[in-house]
Amino acid sequence: MAPRKRNSRGVSFIFCCFRSSEHPEITYRLRNDSNFALQSMEPALPVPPVEELDAMFAELVDELDLSEKHREAMFALSAEKKWQIYCSKKKDHEEGATSWPEFYIDQLNSMAARRTLFAMDKEDEEERNKTIESLKTALRTKPMRFVTRFIDLDGLTCILNFLKSMDYEIAESQIHTSLIGCIKALMNNSQGRAHVLAHTESINVIAQSLATENIKTKVAVLEIMGAVCLVPGGHKKVLEAMLHYQRYASERTRFQTLINDLDRSTGRYRDEVSLKTAIMSFINAVLSQGAGVESLDFRLHLRYEFLMLGIQPVIDKLREHENSTLDRHLDFFEMLRNEDELEFAKRFDLVHIDTKSATQMFELIRKRLTHTESYPHFTSILHHCLQMPYKRSGNTVHYWLLLDRIVQQIVIQNEKGQDPDTSPLENFNVKNVVRMLVNENEVKQWKEQAEKMRKEHNELQQKLEKKERECDAKTQEKEEMMQTLNKMKEKLEKETTEYKNVKQQVAELTAQIQELNSRTVCAPGPGGPPPPPGAPGGPMSMPSGNFMPPPPPPPPPFPGGMAPPPPPPPPPPPPPGGPPPPPGLPLLGAAPPGAPLGLSMKKKNIPQPKNPLKSFNWSKLPDNKLEGTLWIDLDDAKVLKILDLEDIERTFSAYQRQQDFFVNNGIKQKEMDCTDDTLSSKMKVKELSVVDGRRAQNCNILLSRLKLTNEEIKRAILTMDEQEDLPKDMLEQLLKFVPEKSDIDLLEEHKHELDRMAKADRFLFEMSRINHYQQRLQSLYFKKKFAERVAEVKPKVEAIRDASKEVLQSKNLKQLLEVVLAFGNYMNKGQRGNAYGFKISSLNKIADTKSSIDKNITLLHYLITVVEKKYPKIVNLHEELQTISVAAKVNMTELEKEISALRNGLKSVENELEYQKTQPTLPGDKFVSVVSQFITVAGFSFCDVEDLLSEAKELFVKSAKRFGEETNKIQPDEFFGIFDQFLQAFLEAKQENENIRKRKEEEERRIRMEAQLKEQRERERKARKAKENGEEEGEFDDLVSALRSGEVFDKDLSKLKRNRKRIVSQTTESSRERPVTKLNY
């Protein structure tokens, strides 16, 4: 066979591509006898010694990753030929950057980013395709180091990303076919093939290319996937890829697209045999390789998918093409099918099983299982299948689909629990399920025990959380107390020092005054004799009266500027909601005082109801104010005789009737007539409720969420929630259900019926018995929220303080303002120019000035460019003003309101503490001790906040004046907001400048790469032309070629033909049943 020649640099398809227009050309073709036909060439350098040449040539052959047969052929060459090849390789190594993988990877990424051929001319498309073709040639012909380098740089991932990101136009172009060719060329190398198979999604992405209408691309994809089936570990990957393609292409079933393409016979598919051959070759590889080599069940399982898609009629139609290669694949499919069906039928002592007949298949199963332990389960399966829903709905189909997949899984899964096909049911291991069925009782016991342990765990978890809350609260209190103690120590030391200094100054001044007085006594004035000692107005009276030793220092002020505890106050005022009680007012529930002597009112004879009624909440007119009113002339006794008192009693009874259930039959008992007192007393539970219905309902909801008894709630309030039973949100809700004066009055009237009170009523009644219940609750809520509220306020004050310091101390800000001032004076003329300063709000107007060259460029963009060059430190201005953004969100008015609320709340708690000190201590009442400790700690914490606020205000005023702002007209949020807005605009403009710079660099890089590419294409023109004339195939190509021609199935096909003759002979003799060679599905 004549050798194929190339018109460019010498290329060996299986070895390497040696490109050089200067060196002599080598052309050869590998034959079966391993001889080469080489064109003579003159090496440019002298031939080295034989030993040195052999060592150099051995290094070259090792790089080519050749098989042993090909290595021997290479070493059989003469010394001159070896030297020629080595020189060409050396020249190839010295070529430019475009001959290295980095160049191709950059081009692939660039093309993938552009994604579309839209608005591109034909020349651009051809250039892109030439680049990919050049990569394909390099992967086939370059030394091993090129392929290794390409793999190390994630070249395969670049190709796959390009395949995934293609639009429709590229997918239907030659570029798509060339990309698949690159993968095929990469797999023609042992390392490349291993890398493709090891990649997590390579085969899936290759399978996605079946969606194209480009026939060449489809054929290339099918050839690759068919060959992968022949590679160890590749068969299952192909099946997974086809399942992936089913989801990708929204197929109803797997392999649907293949059968559709196989059946298409219109348009360009009418005489298209290559695609149909490739599909049949792929189907045969899927059926006969992988687990199908050994497992009959697996082959039957997979083939059934194709038969259900209607492949048999399509095969009959394909016979009309009369193509020998295609017929070879069709023969193999049918013979393998007949062989498998015969072997399967032997299991049931038959020649053929009609899998289209449900009756025959049922009978075979029934006969096989009769008189076995499995038969009851078989009948159970049939019985429950009869109970399956048969209505035409979406769920019905899915029930049968689930049953089908479970049976498939049982059939194809091997003994080790491994699935040769993609699992019909994920995470479904038949062996494990069987083991679980055997140990079902044991599993049930473990589940019960696990449930018990789970409940115990939850209970312990709740207890642990409760203890953790207690520990956290105690730890926080301890930390606050330690901080307060340290601050008190510092303050005491400071005041002690000041006191000593003042005392020393007073002593010095006293000594000076005494000295002056003594001098005055010794030298009397000329006005007459001095007055006698001790006389009024005499000089000696001053030291004795006015210069006594200084008194001891006063005690330290009370925390928070509060006065020391005053003497016990008078009795507490009444609860809110009513006027203060006048002197002599009887206690709650006692009889009212008698009428005044001037008007004696006779007690009315008013009928009494049998049961308590809801009260009419009126304001009673006192007897001493009745005289002279119309009330004297009214007689309600007449009206009472007319009214239906029983109906009133039924309608406004204080009892709430609740429906109950019969114990025996569980039927809900309807409300009975009130006249049947005997039956009513048995069927209904009476509850006394005088509280408003909606309020009582909301109170019940709150109590159910608390999950505490009234006694536990009472204990928590008295002990100031020592055990952390009352969360802050629950305390806030409890404050909404404080017993009011009207509620207390009504509840006191029925306190003798405590056991019959409704849940909400009893709760309100028992809470009303706590002295100052509302004030205690408010104090407890304030105590729990105090640290949180201080933690919310303090960062806001600190933000104003720190932001003021930052703008005062920032050198870069000062420098920036100086630069902006210079820009402004330069750009502005007339009255707007010649400025010594500007309002800081002008900073945010810099971006309003647009460039006259590019409207997207503003003065701010330009300013940043200048700053980066001339004042690089200013670029990091935001690092010096880190607190600005926080301070810009602080409203001073709202902040002062929050601090004032804290001050008032602290004062209220202090007042309640003073009141409780005057009251007798109840058992378990810890209000005084807990709150006293809290007031001490909270007072010092609040003093810190107030001092911090004063410092922040002072610094803000200083910073505002510093920038020429009027402090009475600008607030911190507005002042710092100006800087914050400017910094954001500054950083955004800086990023935009960076993006513009990157785009410019990318454009320059693209132009440079295109120039290199153009030069590379010119150098490789001859090499591409030689490639079009034909290429020697490598290992993977040999596999693809054998699969395409059907040679890979020749051995199996011959065996099947012999078996077929034997089967026909046996069938003729036995005449039991005619073998079926074709089944139409």
From Swiss-Prot:
Domain DAD: residue ranges: 1030-1061
Basic and acidic residues bias: start-end ranges: 1013-1029, 1070-1081
Pfam families reported for this sequence: Drf_FH3, Drf_GBD, FH2
Segments of skewed composition (Pro residues): 526-536, 548-585
Region (Actin-binding): 696-705
Compartments reported by the entry: Cytoplasm; Cytoplasm, Cytoskeleton, Cilium basal body
Protein name, per record: Disheveled-associated activator of morphogenesis 1-A
Source species: Xenopus laevis
